[in-house]
């Protein structure tokens, strides 16, 4: 981090580019109108007007070129590498999260905005949203993208009972493969591998997606499968085995294990 030097902020560049973009837009509009006039004058044989408007087009083209050069100079003066390496981008991203109410945790350069994982690549000035590279130098825009994605996920249809039953099936397979006793606590991270056994499946259904589904199951309050087996989440002292989710109130909850068991009362 720099000492007393002025902090970089994309919003300052954005404000600088706004009037320059307007100049470019106006220049393009002027050229388009003049070109239409030139086409009409060429067809009608109006040489005097044609000569005048071609001259006007040349002047408009020079003005447009000048406006584009100003934009290039503004962009050239913005050191993207320093913006990332100084921590200014990260600090403004965190501020945008607070402003927009997006939950975030982690430390530079890796953050979690549940259920997304955000990584800042300072060497190449790239942002990764999970595995996807996002070309974004504006913290506010990045956080808005995350927020939109979260809203889309939350609106997507989800059958908690069906998911619970799928988990139960994977659990039974895991109990057999791992030679555990029925009803034993199994780590969710281990169960995930049975739910998505092949690597190509994990690309489409990664652990962040798994965590999001766990959160929706947790929030649903469902604690029994279709065939009557009870399910119970559990904690762990091993933080590496915990999966962080957010509850209905946006508070973080750490889940580590799960077990499915037959309620003795139901067997009577």
Where are these regions (language model features)?
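Short amphipathic alpha-helical interaction segments
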Residues: 202-221
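C-terminal engagement modules used by replication, chromatin/transcription, nuclear envelope/ESCRT
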Residues: 216-268
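Non-catalytic, well-ordered alpha-helical scaffold segments
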Residues: 114, 121-123, 161, 165, ...
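Long, compositionally biased intrinsically disordered regions
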Residues: 1-157
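Short secondary-structure junctions and interdomain/linker hinges
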Residues: 38, 100, 104, 174-178, ...
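Positively charged, polyanion-binding regions of nucleic-acid-associated proteins
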Residues: 157-200
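Generic structural motif
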Residues: 123, 132, 198, 263-265
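Short helix-coil junctions and helix-kink-helix linkers
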Residues: 79-84, 193-204
């Amino acid at each position: 981090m720099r000492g007393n030097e002025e902090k970089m902020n994309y919003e300052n560049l954005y404000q600088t580019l706004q009037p320059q973009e307007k100049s470019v837009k106006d220049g393009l509009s002027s050229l388009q109108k003049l070109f239409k006039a030139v086409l009409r004058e060429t067809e009608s044989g109006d040489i005097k007007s044609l000569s005048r408007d071609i001259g006007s087009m040349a002047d408009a083209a020079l003005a447009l070129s000048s406006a584009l050069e100003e934009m290039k100079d503004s962009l050239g003066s913005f050191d993207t590498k320093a913006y990332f390496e100084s921590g200014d981008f990260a600090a403004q991203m965190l501020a945008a999260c607070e402003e927009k109410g997006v939950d975030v945790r982690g430390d530079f350069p890796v953050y979690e905005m549940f259920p997304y994982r955000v990584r800042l690549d300072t060497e190449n000035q790239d942002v990764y949203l999970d595995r996807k590279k996002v070309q974004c130098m504006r913290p506010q825009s990045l956080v808005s993208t995350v927020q939109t994605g979260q809203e889309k996920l939350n609106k997507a249809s989800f059958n908690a009972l069906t998911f619970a039953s799928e988990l139960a099936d994977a659990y039974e397979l895991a109990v057999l493969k791992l030679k555990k006793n029925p009803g034993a606590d199994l780590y969710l991270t281990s169960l995930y591998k049975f739910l998505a056994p092949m690597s190509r499946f994990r690309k489409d259904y990664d652990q962040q997606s798994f965590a999001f589904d766990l959160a929706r199951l947790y929030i649903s309050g469902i604690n029994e499968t279709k065939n009557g087996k009870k399910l119970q989440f559990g904690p762990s002292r091993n933080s590496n085995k915990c999966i962080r989710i957010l509850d209905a109130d946006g508070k973080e909850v750490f889940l580590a294990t799960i077990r499915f068991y037959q309620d003795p009362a139901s067997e009577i």
